[in-house]
Amino acid sequence: ARPVLNRGPIGMAHFDYDGFFGDSLAQLHREARYRHFRALGRELAPGPVAFTTLDGVRRAVTVWCSNDYLGMSRHPVVLEASRHALARYGAGAGGTRNISGTHDPIVALESELAALHGKPAALVFSSGYVANDTVLATLAARLPDCLVFSDADNHASMIEGIRRSRAETRVFPHSDPAALDAMLAVAEPGRPKLVAFESLYSMNGDVAPLRELLAVARRHGALSYVDETHAVGVHGPTGGGLLEAHGLLEQADIV
């Protein structure tokens, strides 16, 4: 018999939590969807190399899925700056910025990022996923009766943020300015609109037709939200991304 978690007084019927979770895990295994996390040792060595142990043997692994495109996590200047920051500031603020304030280095970083993208201000999040999710969820929810236009191949973080906003959403074909133009043309002119897309798509390597998409959004009075996650640092004269590379920083509203 399957053991049952005791969640109520003795003798009282209660939900079989163990059974539910056990059946759910078994279903994942049957569908080959149960995720196993590979343990990797990432040492300070020329990338993209890591190490794992298979059948008791330590083996080198080539990591092709890293976002550390320029190897900055191993760069000696970055490592020295990290050591200096740890020695001076410690390992954390001890609380959120709302409660404990914001460290001077974060303020400086946000100013530098704003300048890099040609914007009046910037805000640092804990990850790119959190940034997309939070900004899109908040922005689309706060704009009254906002209508969101989302590229069909947008990252899951963007899709989740838009979903959480509960704003009406229309998905346009991937990187198709003409289709976006047609969809915006039938939207109410005075209604707040947000067009969200990526500049460089991480899943397939596509580069969006930035100039055309931004022109369509502006022509219809829509705000533009451009995810430059995989282009920053790699493209542009100063690493500002594809918007900088194509001279379009001023055309994009939110980066």
Question: Which stretches of residues belong to each language-model region?
Answer:
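Substrate-binding/gating loop at the entrance of the active-site cleft, primarily
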Residues: 127, 149-165
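Conserved PLP-anchoring active-site segment centered on the Schiff-base-forming lysine
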Residues: 135-156
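Conserved N-terminal alpha-helix of the aminotransferase class I/II PLP-enzyme fold
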Residues: 79-127
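Active-site phosphate-binding strand-loop segment of PLP-dependent enzymes
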Residues: 68, 170, 174-226
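Conserved active-site segment immediately N-terminal to the catalytic lysine
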Residues: 221, 240-255
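N-terminal "arm"/small-domain region of PLP-dependent enzymes with the aminotransferase-like
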Residues: 13-89, 222, 254
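Short, small-residue-enriched loops and turns at beta-alpha junctions
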Residues: 71-72, 99-103, 156, 177-178, ...
